[in-house]
Amino acid sequence: MTEQYFAKQPSAESRPVETEFTYRGHTLRLMTDSGVFSRGSVDEGSALLLESLPELKGRVLDLGCGAGVIGVCVGKVNSIELTQSDVNRRALALTEENLKRNDVSGTVIESDGFAARMKGRQL
């Protein structure tokens, strides 16, 4: 059976790969990896979601962030307080790296999405 993306510690061998994605005039350099959703490229569903988003303000939660693609994109073009969360530790490391690579501010939290585990944050 194929490992799911919600494994805390993916057993798939790490094989990081860089991809580029242009969002609203900004070319973003993103790292992806095995055991994390959409290795190697931004999937069509995420691209469609990003394309349809309005301008965002205030607090934004990217729950189940994977490599952080959606949060990094919206954080690059909006003045927001970004929190990205995932249960997958490899995904969280990629999210932190992708925030830094693209000069986007955000908080990264390991969580399965339950409010009690969001370290008291109101989102």
Locate each region found by the language model.
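N-terminal auxiliary segments of SAM/dcSAM-dependent transferases
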Residues: 1-24, 35
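Well-ordered beta-strand scaffold positions
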Residues: 26-28
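Class I SAM-dependent methyltransferase Rossmann-like catalytic core
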Residues: 32-39
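Short, glycine/acidic-enriched capping/hinge loops at junctions between secondary-structure elements
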Residues: 41-43
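Conserved SAM/SAH cofactor-binding pocket of Class I
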Residues: 45-122
